[in-house]
Swiss-Prot record:
InterPro entries xrefs: AAA_dom (IPR025669), P-loop_NTPase (IPR027417), ParA/MinD_ATPase (IPR050625)
Native source organism of the sequence: Methanocaldococcus jannaschii (strain ATCC 43067 / DSM 2661 / JAL-1 / JCM 10045 / NBRC 100440) (Methanococcus jannaschii)
Signal peptide start-end: none
Keyword tags: ATP-binding, Nucleotide-binding
List of residues binding ATP: I8, Q9, G10, G11, T12, G13, K14, T15
Gene Ontology MF annotations: ATP binding; ATP hydrolysis activity
UniProt-recorded name of the protein: Uncharacterized ATP-binding protein MJ0410
Pfam families according to UniProt: AAA_31
Record's keyword annotation contains ATP-binding: yes
GO cellular component: cytoplasmic side of plasma membrane; cytosol
Length: 264
């Protein structure tokens, strides 16, 4: 299962929601988080990976192997992007991104993408439209303001036009400034504004590990989304993997028997 978090507007808290959602999921299913913002990603800061040599940028440049760029925070696997100014000097072969995803699909139950807030081809969400199924569902992360609602509506329309499945919109940083439900039909969750969220960037730990009002709502929302949208798909995925493993085992046994018959 591949879920992307996106909005054409930056600053809505998309990385916070994606990273904490992924962290919560990782406690029950094998999950990897990919920061897809090759120029402005900040996942490395959240998880304390700023000094790591290998990252998505070096992989896309052909300088790192897949196994080199995967790091772990507790049970969550993470692929981050470079947070230094070196990002502007990397050459990026986005064809390598497809190779990456196809390999990760074999290893992880859930892939979470934190997509950048742009509509250019260096955004995998846009660059791979119609080529292979990069993502199964997209969650739009907006915030409690009129400008964000406007851009969230545009984002929803864009996702629909691209033919990508829309899970809905999460309204982040809610302070009661707007009546979201009267404007947008696809709201699946509301997360409160909580100044404690900024602590995660200082402490390099996901905010859901710290007791806050945001943590309570984020955890409940993540579990609800998982129960509605993931359980059936994960059961099907595991059944397919089991069938494939049995098939491969059968082929091995058949080959061994053929070899034994040959020796006889």
């Amino acid at each position: 299962m591949k879920i992307g978090f996106y909005n054409i507007q930056g600053g809505t808290g998309k990385t916070t929601v994606a990273a904490n959602f992924a962290y919560i999921l990782s406690q029950s299913v094998k999950t990897i988080l990919i920061d897809c913002d090759i120029y402005g990603g900040t996942t490395a800061v959240l998880f304390g990976l700023e000094d790591k040599e290998h990252n998505l940028n070096t992989y896309l440049a052909g300088d790192s192997a897949i196994e080199d760029i995967i790091y772990h925070y507790d049970d969550l696997a993470i692929i981050h992007t470079d947070v230094s100014s070196k990002v502007f000097g990397y050459k990026s072969d986005l064809n390598r991104f497809e190779t990456l995803v196809k390999e990760l699909e074999e290893e992880y139950d859930v892939i979470i993408y934190d997509f950048p807030p742009n509509i250019t081809e260096d955004n995998p969400l846009i660059g791979y439209v119609g080529e292979f199924e990069l993502v199964n569902k997209v969650v739009v992360v907006g915030e409690d303001s009129i400008p964000s609602i406007v851009n969230s509506l545009k984002t929803i329309e864009l996702i629909t036009d691209l033919g990508i499945g829309l899970t809905g919109i999460i309204v982040n940083k809610y302070r009661g400034l707007t009546d979201i439900s009267e404007i947008i039909d696809d709201v699946i969750g509301v997360l409160p504004y909580d100044q404690n969220v900024e602590r995660q960037w200082v402490e390099s730990t996901p905010i859901v590990k710290i007791k806050t009002k945001f943590t309570k709502e984020m955890t409940a929302l993540a579990n609800e989304i998982a129960s509605i949208y993931l359980e059936k798909d994960l059961a099907s995925l595991r059944a397919l993997r089991l069938a494939k493993a049995i098939s491969e085992l059968t082929e091995v046994e058949k080959s061994e028997k053929d070899f034994e018959d040959y020796l006889e």
